[in-house]
Amino acid sequence: MSPTIFREGSFRFFFFSREESRMHVHVSHPDGEAKFWLTPALALATSAGLSPKQIKEAENIVAVHLEEIDYAWRTHFPG
């Protein structure tokens, strides 16, 4: 299961229900995908198919929505 947190432009932001416990978010785009760590600081974990410009755009969107992503994570993974 991979609940969508939100969509913005051509990006979809989501996480997988049965994955590691360190807070992170996955990003999909028609051109590729990326994963960003949210703790201890926002950082790119992996990417495939996205241009540097698309990665930066996704990272900026994640930064703007950090509180929303954090809330979704803590709601989905209580405790």
Regions picked out by a protein language model, each given a short descriptive name:
Residues 5, 43-47, 65:
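Generic preference for hydrophobic/aromatic residues in regular secondary structure cores
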Residues 14-50:
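A short, structured beta-strand/loop element
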Residues 6-8, 24, 68, 72:
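Alpha-helical structural elements
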Residues 49-79:
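C-terminal structural segments of small proteins and small subunits
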Residues 1-11:
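Negatively charged, low-complexity tracts enriched in Asp/Glu with abundant Ser/Thr
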